Amino acid sequence: LVDRHCKPLSLSEKYKENPDAMFVLWKDHTAEHEAAEINNADRLSGKGYSRHSGGHYSAECFWAKVLRVLRHSPELQNEASTAIELCDWIPAVLTGVDDITKMRVGLCAAGAKRMWAEEWGGYPPEEFFNGIDGKLVPILRNMPDKVYGCDKEAGRITAEWADKLGLSRDVLIGIGNIDSHSGAVGAGITLGTMAMNLGTSACFMAITRKNPHVI
């Protein structure tokens, strides 16, 4: 959860000791109940908003985690402008973005974690989220609706960060991307091949001309 200046609430004095104000680790499964609610709402809608993530919305994904946090620590709702992925926040920090409306977010996490898709015009509509829990609507409204591929730039590194990291001030920062997806690209994945990313989890990535609706 971040304020309108893209600052995580956990970096404020008021919430620095509140775990719900911090980034939530991907493998946290405390939002199983919320994920089940989202899956039920998706089935009832008949729209298939989770079709590009295997037809099932996981507790490891964005909306389930956000809803669980807002229910567990409702006081954060008044302070939060929206919620963002870590892979989107870091490029914003490095490029000096301090306005949520000017932040460039990546297509990768939006599609895999937040049910964004061109075919329904971006994110699912407000009515879908309101039917699950109205707490999600302000988060949706304040979220940047334009997304960018990882081949695009987020901006130029700030002088402060360039000097701190010992980099040229001409360095361009790329759009954020999910690590396992980036690993597949780095491994040289091509049509008809599979890349296995092994770490704290195992992600098997493949490219096919077919559209099985599985990530």
Residue ranges and their predicted role:
Residues R4-L11, N39, G46-N177:
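Gly/Ser/Thr-rich active-site cleft segment
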Residues D28:
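Carbohydrate-associated surface elements
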Residues L1, C150-K152, L198-T200:
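Glycine-rich beta-strand-to-loop/alpha-helix junction loops that act as flexible
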Residues E13-K16, D20-L25:
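Short, acidic/small-residue loops that bind anionic groups at enzyme active sites
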Residues D20-M22, N78-S81, N142-P144, S168-V171, ...:
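Short coil/turn connectors at secondary-structure junctions
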Residues V2-Y15, G188-L191, R209-K210:
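Glycine-rich loop at the start of a catalytic domain that most often binds anionic cofactors/ligands
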Residues S10-L11, E34-A35, V93-L94, T101-K102, ...:
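Short helix/loop capping segments that flank catalytic or ligand/cofactor-binding pockets
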Residues V171, G176-I215:
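Catalytic phosphate/nucleotide-handling subdomain of diverse soluble enzymes
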